Structures are given as C-alpha cells and as structure tokens.
Swiss-Prot record:
It comes from Rubus idaeus (Raspberry). The active site is at 164. Keywords: Acyltransferase, Transferase. Disulfide bonds: none annotated. Pathway: Secondary metabolite biosynthesis; flavonoid biosynthesis. GO terms for biological process: flavonoid biosynthetic process; polyketide biosynthetic process. It holds the Pfam family Chal_sti_synt_C. Belongs to the thiolase-like superfamily. Chalcone/stilbene synthases family. This is Polyketide synthase 1.
C-alpha cells in the first residue's frame, strides 16, 4: 500500500523552478512620446485647454519614454468618441475591444516563447494568464487555450486586475506550480492593453494624466519548469524565492476602479517615496538567507513604474547607474506596460548578457532581484539565480 507521504514525494520536482523561454509582443501602432501631447489633445478635442496641455507636455518630456505601442489608433478613437471624453459611459466599447485583443496579443508572445522552448505545446501542463483589463467569462485564459490549440486538460489560472506588481505574482505562482508538480511546464502570459484606461484630460484629476503619459501596450510570455531536460531545454534563470508584502501607511497610494467610464486610475500618495523608503527591508528579508548585503552585486529587474521611482530607489540604495539600465531602457522603448514590464526586462537582460559576452544570463553576476510594485501598495520580490550564458 502506497502512503500519502510517498505520493507527495513522487509529485514534487527535485530542482528549482526555472525560466526556460521568453517571448514578447506589441501592437503594430507605435506612438512617439515627443509628439504625443499634440495628438492626445487633438484626438480628445481638448486643444483649448492650453495650460493643461503644457503640463501634459512637461509630464511626457520628464517621463524618460521615447515611444510606446498602443492598440488604440486614431481611426478606432474616432469611431468611439465616448472613449475620448474624461468621464463618458464607454465600458461596453472598451470591453468589446479588449476581450478579443488581449488573448490575441498574448498568443503572439506565447507563440514566440514556445518556439524558443522548442518543445511541443502538448507538453504544457499549466497556464497562468494575467491582465489588468478585459474581465470576461470564460476568461482570456480559456480564449488563449483555444487560440494556441493547447490540450483541453491544461490547468488554467486567470488573474484579472492585479496591476503593475503582477509580473512578480505570476513568477511566484509559476514557481509553486512547477516545483510541486513533477514534470510540469507552466506557460505564463501577461497581456496588457490600455484601451480600458484611455480617456480625455481633466483639470481637476492630474493623476489620470500621469497614467496617460506613462502607460503602453505589450504582452510577454515565459515557460517555467523544474529539472530542465539536459541538451533539450535551455535554462535562463532559476526562481529561488518569492515574497509579497503590503507597504505600511500606503492605503490608497495607487487605485484602479472599473466603472461605466472604463478603468479609472488614481495616484494619491508619494509612491516613489513609499517604495524607496521600504525597499531595503524587502531586500534584506529576501537575501539574508544568502548572506548578501551588497545590492550592487546583484543584477536588477525592477518594474519601471516611472522615472521618479527608479531615481529614488537608485539613490536610496546607492545603486550604480548600470544596475537599472535594462529597466530604464524598457521604460524608454515601451513605456509602462503594467504586469508585462518585468518579463520584457528579463528578456533584455538575458539578451544583452549574451551580446556583451557575459559568463551568465544575469550580466555576468550570479544573483539577481526582480521587483513588482503596484496597487495596495503591493510589492513582489523574486530572488533570481542566473545560469551560464550560451550563445
């Protein structure tokens, strides 16, 4: 007779969860940040608000973003004028777009990840899908399963409306799934489209304008599994530990509310200050078991909420400028893509590591940290271990 203990041991993987492939995708429509204020105030019929436009221009200039990708084109917005007002009922129009486009963009990223992984998609056992928008039943996880032609028995988990920290959350979940299910191969997809948050400007709600200056669209996918098959699967990063915490005194710092007008975005407190004040505590808790206290000895993947967050974290921890280079580069080239950002940065770090001839996937370093920041104020901290870089 087999015991429960024996069954449990047989179910568990031996090694740590490992990222085996990464894929990314964006909509084709690319928006230049320097000319975006002109376009935004024209399309929302707000050109008479000259002072507000000047404020928005300054926001865009200070954003450190060069360009963003957006599903919403001028043609789509002209067909849906209610989306261009500040608070017009428009949820139906927005939902009709995102319930179709979010799985579609996710499929593009997932297809790239599966191709890099090199294994048949029938070997995918679990699917974790994350998006801040497009709540529907059956969800984007179901739609993606159909679009990709995954097995109907794939075990799905759908995460809606978590916000910008969720790129860390999906790694935490994928780690637990891979390590507790021997042979599991988890497809993780973060797909974000700003069609639910786009709206016209308001003199009295500048926090909404901050969102209009920062957010972009993108999807990223990874394959996670333990005990990679030698000579068949190519490990990129090992997921060593994962933690989540709510920062003290941060209630209402970042809020998003789904209403008839779409998803409203509220920035109420000093978010960069709250994060920089508390980040060392998260680092100490994560790296104490490894006896690491030199934050410059790590490679960094931080959610780029905005330049002020990165500047204050850098200053508080005394980080060398190159530590957040990959993070700043993704912010510059894509804007803030919410949950997908950290996976884009992971992709950038491993590619640059190979291109620059580093010995490991983590810029030549052994250990790294991945941070997600978002509503709550919630912080996700993931400890990464790099592997030998292969060309």
């Amino acid at each position: 007779m087999v015991t429960v203990d024996e069954v449990r041991k047989a179910q568990r993987a031996e090694g740590p969860a490992t990222i085996l492939a990464i894929g990314t995708a964006t909509p084709p429509n690319c928006v230049d940040q320097s000319t975006y204020p002109d376009y935004y105030f024209r399309i929302t019929k707000s050109e008479h608000k000259t002072e507000l436009k000047e404020k928005f221009q300054r926001m865009c200039d200070k954003s450190m973003i060069k360009k963003r990708y957006m599903y919403l084109t001028e043609e789509i917005l002209k067909e849906n004028p209610s989306m261009c007002e500040y608070m017009a009922p428009s949820l139906d129009a927005r939902q009709d777009m995102v319930v179709v486009e979010i799985p579609k963009l996710g499929k593009e990223a997932a297809t790239k990840a599966i191709k890099e992984w090199g294994q048949p998609k029938s070997k995918i056992t679990h699917l974790v899908f994350c998006t801040t928008s497009g709540v529907d039943m059956p969800g984007a996880d179901y739609q993606l399963t159909k679009l990709l032609g995954l097995r109907p028995s794939v075990k799905r988990l759908m995460m809606y409306q978590q916000g910008c920290f969720a790129g860390g959350t999906v790694l935490r979940l994928a780690k637990d799934l891979a390590e507790n299910n021997k042979g599991a191969r988890v497809l993780v997809v973060c797909s974000e489209i700003t069609a639910v948050t786009f709206r016209g400007p308001s003199d009295t709600h500048l926090d909404s304008l901050v969102g209009q200056a920062l957010f972009g669209d993108g999807a990223a996918a990874i394959i996670v599994g333990s005990d990679p098959l030698p000579d068949i699967e190519r490990p990129l990063f090992e997921l060593v530990s994962a933690a989540q915490t709510i920062l003290p005194d941060s209630d209402g710092a970042i809020d998003g509310h789904l209403r008839e007008v779409g998803l409203t975005f509220h920035l109420l407190k000093d978010v960069p200050g709250l994060i920089s004040k508390n980040i060392e505590k998260s680092l100490n808790e994560a790296f104490k078991p490894l006896d690491i206290t030199d934050w410059n000895s790590l490679f960094w993947i931080a959610h780029p909420g905005g330049p002020a967050i990165l500047d204050q974290v850098e200053a508080k921890l005394g980080l060398k400028p190159e530590k957040l280079e990959a993070t700043r580069n993704i912010l510059s080239e894509y804007g803030n893509m919410s949950s997908a950002c950290v996976l884009f940065i992971l992709d950038e770090v491993r590619r640059k590591s190979v291109a620059n001839g580093h010995k490991t996937t983590g810029e030549g370093l052994e250990w790294g940290v991945l941070f997600g920041f978002g509503p709550g104020l919630t912080v996700e901290t993931v400890v990464l271990h790099s592997v030998a870089a292969s060309t």
